Structures are given as C-alpha cells and as structure tokens.
C-alpha cells in the first residue's frame, strides 16, 4: 500500500516539474524516486496485510512482481531522456504517464477486490492508449493508438461483463469471500462463465492466440519506446494479473464437474501451443524488427501460459520467466532505439554491419536475442528449463515437446537479425554514445546473465 501511495505521489511531482519548468531534472529525479520506491517495496517484502476493506492486499506475490515492475519502469524512464530529446516541452507528461502506468500495474497485482482489479487495468490501459498515439504527426502512430484503443475497449468490456456475472453469482466483489464461497458444493453456473469471460479479456491483454491480431500493427506503429513498454512491462503485468486472478478466485478447484476442469486445462493447452506456434511461424517472415518482436512476444505468452497447468506451485517459475523475458526485451529495445533513432523504420537493414560499427551494442543485442531463444548461459534458457521440468513432472509431455520444437524454430528468426549485424556491410557510420542507452543496455543484459547464473535468487522468492 505504501508503495502504491509513493508511486502516485511521484507521478504528481513529475507533473509539477512541468509547471515549475524543471524539465531537465525530471529524468534523474524520477529514477531516484523510483529507486526509493523500490527500497520501500523491498522493506515490505514478506509482510501480509490488507487495506481499505480488503481492496488492496499485500503479499509476497504482489511485492515480488511490483519490484520487477519498478525495475522495468526505471529502465524505461532512463531511455526516455534520449528518446524525447526533440520533445522536451512534453517530456514531463510522458514521464508522468509512465509513472501512473506503474501505479496501475502495482494495483493489478495487489488487488483484493474485483473493483480494484478493474481500476488497475483501466489506469494501465488508458496510459498505453495515449503513449501508442503520442507521435501525433505520424499516421502509423495514430493508427496504432486507435487500433489499441478499440481492441482494449472490447477486452475491458468483456472483463467487466465477466465481473458482473461473478458478482451476480457470489453477491460480492471481494476476492477472499469469492474464494471461500467457491469451495461450497453448490456453485452457480454464472461463476465459471464470468471467470471464462474475464480470462478471455485478459488473453486480449497478453496477446495470446486467437486474441493476438492487434499486436503486430500496434507494436509496429507505436513509437519504439512505447513498443518496448508494451512488450515488456505491459505483457508481464497482464500475465501476472491473470495468474493471480485464476489462483485467487479458485477457478480450477471450483469446477466440480471433472469434464469442466478437463475442458479448462485443454483450452489452456490449446491456446498455449497455438500462441507458441503462430507467433514463431509468423515471426520468421518479418523484416521489421518491432513487428518480429511482437510475434516473438505472442510466442512467449504461450510459454508463460504453461505455468497455469501447475498453478498451485508455479508462481516462482512465472516470476523467473517474466523477469528473464522482460530484461532481455529491455536490452534489445535499448539497442533498437540507438540504431533506429533517425530512421523512418525499424527494418533489419538498419542493423547491417552493427557488429563492425558498434561491437558492444551488437553483442548486447545478440545476448538478448539468445536469451529469448533459450540459449545458455542466459536466464532465458533456465526459465524454459524450469518451465519444461515442471510441466513434465505434472505429466504434460505433449506440450513440452511442442514447446521445445517452437524454441528451435525461434532461433531461426533471432539468428536472421544476428547474421545481419555480423555478416553484412554497414549502411552508415553511427556517431555518438548516449550514456543512458548504454547504461540501460549493459545493466539489463548483466542482470539477465546474473539471473541465469544464480536462478535461486528469484525462484525462491515465491516458493
């Protein structure tokens, strides 16, 4: 709760910086403020409490994921300094939106009431709609903002309809009361229907197949920094929230009918395999790097959904996987922001010869792509290893085989970009070494490797 209040206060201070004309100091001030919020969040780790009639609940799950969200936001704010250098008059607005977006993200994993859950989703979503369309003179950005707004509105409507059905079945929005009522023998049919509608709405948010069709166009059309935010922070928030929703509302045990329970498991299996396969196959044919990473994100959503098959014991694995994926994504987009800063697009041709003109950033991008592909020593490899091991122990052999095949396929399009950096001649000489871009890229890939070398640091937090 203190974390949420501190984040909201920091967002208000960011808006005041615009009024007081302190724009030059807003990025370092916000980073220092977020580091203070992170320390406060660490201090609360291990405590369990509820606030405002259980509207907000603090637990290890919420604190651990909130820490990850804060770290990712620090990186994104740091990247804003160079990205918005030509829009200095608006930089405080963009920074404040990111901080308020973080408040929505923390609320989404700290909810104890469905009203707070929906409020968190809307805070996050509205901030993303604005950021997607923030390049107002770019028609692709306008199109991305409109598409994202329409699809997000439909998803929010479906979620709200599900919440209404759950309220009709249980007579309360409180998660603890719903959980307790779901253990009873007599359970209204509206409850599983409402839960299924909420799950479908969240599948839109994480861009899982077949609810993924908005992602490639929105990722490609949005400003590169917004795409980085969507593919890392927003996706991780949505999958963590869905995990808490399904486990907190006791959906799977509440399906007393064995056929219903098996149906839910089969749906998760189908969507997981479909997301992995469609995402990887479509990524193979992409020449735009942002669009390629959009399909890669769809594929990773399929991998993350595998944790729902063993939901009682997989919170630690989900935290580890999301951390590994998000850190690799931040490192990759740091390099993309540097390479494509003055370009009209983010095509692979822009990366030709990067290994010769800037070996350090080429190595960082290579490392982040190898992590996403599941190559050791990066944490992406161990994330998939722990995920597959858990699924095998639960008896889900078929999905593990499909996941391994898809991991092999993904290496194909990652190496397409890697080969372009090292085997092609550079198109142009790039000058300048922006400190914050280099710092974010080095620290994020360093943290990714550290998680691979010491996985227990994250895995044991929620086990």
From Swiss-Prot:
The chain crosses the membrane at residues 2-22, 25-45, 61-81, 91-110, 114-133, 149-169, 189-209, 223-243, 264-284, 292-312, 317-337, 362-382, 395-415, 434-454. It is found in: Cell inner membrane. InterPro entries: NADH-Q_OxRdtase_suN/2 (IPR010096), ND/Mrp_TM (IPR001750). Keywords: Cell inner membrane, Cell membrane, Membrane, NAD, Quinone, Translocase, Transmembrane, Transmembrane helix, Transport. Its EC number is 7.1.1.-. GO terms for biological process: ATP synthesis coupled electron transport. It catalyses: a quinone + NADH + 5 H(+)(in) = a quinol + NAD(+) + 4 H(+)(out). It holds the Pfam family Proton_antipo_M. One of its GO terms (molecular function) is NADH:ubiquinone reductase (non-electrogenic) activity. It is a multi-pass membrane protein. Disulfide bonds: none annotated. The keyword Transmembrane applies. It comes from the Bacteria. The keyword Zinc does not apply. It is an enzyme of class 7 (translocase). GO terms for cellular component: plasma membrane. Its main location: membrane. Belongs to the complex I subunit 2 family. NDH-1 shuttles electrons from NADH, via FMN and iron-sulfur (Fe-S) centers, to quinones in the respiratory chain. The immediate electron acceptor for the enzyme in this species is believed to be a menaquinone. Couples the redox reaction to proton translocation (for every two electrons transferred, four hydrogen ions are translocated across the cytoplasmic membrane), and thus conserves the redox energy in a proton gradient. NDH-1 is composed of 14 different subunits. Subunits NuoA, H, J, K, L, M, N constitute the membrane sector of the complex. HAMAP family: NDH1_NuoN_1 (MF_00445). This is NADH-quinone oxidoreductase subunit N. It comes from Flavobacterium johnsoniae (strain ATCC 17061 / DSM 2064 / JCM 8514 / BCRC 14874 / CCUG 350202 / NBRC 14942 / NCIMB 11054 / UW101) (Cytophaga johnsonae).
């Amino acid at each position: 709760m203190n974390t949420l209040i501190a984040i909201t206060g920091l967002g208000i201070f960011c808006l005041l910086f615009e009024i007081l004309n302190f724009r030059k100091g807003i990025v370092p001030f916000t980073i220092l403020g977020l580091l203070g919020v992170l320390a406060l969040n660490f201090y609360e780790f291990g405590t369990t409490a509820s606030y405002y009639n259980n509207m907000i609940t603090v637990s290890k799950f919420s604190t651990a994921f909130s820490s990850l969200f804060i770290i990712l936001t620090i990186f994104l704010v740091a990247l804003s300094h160079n990205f918005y250098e030509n829009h200095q008059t608006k930089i405080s607005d963009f920074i404040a939106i990111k901080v308020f977006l973080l408040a929505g993200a923390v609320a989404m994993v700290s909810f104890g009431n469905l009203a707070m859950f929906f409020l968190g989703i809307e805070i996050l979503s509205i901030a993303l709609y604005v950021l997607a369309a923030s390049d107002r003179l770019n028609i692709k950005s306008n199109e991305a903002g409109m598409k994202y707004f329409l699809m997000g509105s439909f998803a929010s409507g479906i979620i709200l309809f599900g919440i209404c059905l759950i309220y009709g079945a249980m007579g309360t929005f409180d998660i603890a009361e719903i959980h307790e009522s779901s253990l009873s023998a007599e359970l209204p049919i509206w409850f599983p229907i409402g839960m299924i509608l909420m799950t479908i709405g969240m599948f839109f948010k994480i861009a899982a197949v077949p609810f993924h069709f908005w992602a490639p166009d929105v990722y490609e059309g949005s400003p590169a920094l917004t795409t980085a935010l969507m593919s890392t922070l927003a996706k991780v928030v949505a999958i963590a929230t869905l995990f808490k929703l399904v486990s907190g509302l006791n959906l799977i045990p509440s399906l007393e009918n064995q056929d219903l329970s098996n149906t839910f498991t089969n749906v998760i299996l189908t969507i997981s395999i479909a997301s992995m396969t469609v995402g990887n196959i479509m990524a193979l044919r992409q020449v735009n790097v942002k669009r390629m990473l959009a399909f890669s994100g769809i594929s990773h959503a399929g991998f993350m959904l595998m944790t729902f098959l063993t939901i009682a014991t997989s919170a630690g694995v989900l935290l580890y996987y999301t951390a590994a994926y998000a850190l690799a994504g931040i490192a990759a987009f740091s390099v993309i922001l540097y390479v494509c800063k003055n370009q009209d697009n983010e095509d692979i041709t822009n990366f030709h010869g990067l290994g010769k003109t800037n070996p350090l950033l080429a190595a960082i991008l290579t490392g982040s792509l190898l992590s996403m592909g599941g190559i050791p020593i990066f944490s992406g490899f161990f994330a998939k290893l722990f995920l597959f091991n858990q699924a095998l122990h639960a008896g889900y052999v078929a999905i593990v085989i499909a996941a391994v095949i898809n991991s092999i396929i993904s290496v194909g399009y990652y190496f397409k970009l890697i080969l372009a950096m090292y085997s092609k001649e550079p198109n142009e000489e790039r000058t300048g070494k922006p400190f914050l871009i280099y710092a974010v890229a080095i620290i994020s890939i360093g943290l990714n490797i550290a998680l691979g070398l010491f996985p227990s640091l994250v895995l044991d937090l929620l086990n």
